[in-house]
Design a protein with these regions (language model features):
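Extended hydrophobic leader/signal-anchor segments used for secretion and membrane insertion
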Residues: 1-171
Length: 171
């Protein structure tokens, strides 16, 4: 009996295998975003073009191997063969091996609109600020989400996503 989630699992496996094959040959590849951890920069269903780079900078949106799958998050910093990444809307960050980074997002397609990621440094700073607010509230998600500074950052990010999407449709 097929479960309803099987097609999604098949798509993830296909994306992962295809991405790994292209990455080994240093070719750009595309994958579909699933989930909301990168909202508002990326949303569920967006397609991202990814290219391997010699070096990655804080603020870059990167794709890395994690728990047998691929994850798309923002790079906060990298040192000593380790990288710290975080989804823009996540409260937690994760440490990954720099070897597991497959590439950097170079373009995003949402529907008929394609655009390049905006200032990664700005978004990394805002994402880090959200993390600091979360830590200040003792890692209490509910208290964090009620914090005026957190709400202001969220409002700004959602407005930015809306603005970028509407600008792209005018092209």
């Amino acid at each position: 009996m097929n479960s309803p989630s099987r097609p999604l699992a098949d798509r993830r496996l296909t994306d992962r295998l295809f991405a790994l094959a292209l990455q080994k040959n240093d070719l750009p590849f595309e994958i579909s975003v699933t989930g909301g951890s990168m909202s508002p920069s990326l949303k569920d269903g967006d397609c991202v073009a990814v290219r391997r780079e010699d070096a990655y900078l804080p603020g870059d949106i990167v794709v890395f191997r994690q728990n047998g799958g691929l994850t798309v998050h923002r790079l906060l910093w990298q040192a000593g063969g380790r990288a710290v990444c975080k989804g823009d809307s996540n409260l937690f960050r994760e440490e990954v091996s720099a070897e597991d980074i497959l590439g950097k997002v170079i373009a995003v397609s949402c529907g008929d609109v394609t655009f390049s990621p905006i200032s990664g440094q700005l978004l990394a700073a805002l994402s880090y600020e959200k993390l600091l607010i979360f830590k200040a509230h003792g890692e209490d998600r509910q208290a964090t989400r009620r914090d005026p500074a957190y709400l202001e950052i969220q409002h700004f990010l959602h407005g930015l996503r809306y603005s970028l999407t509407n600008e792209g449709t005018k092209r």
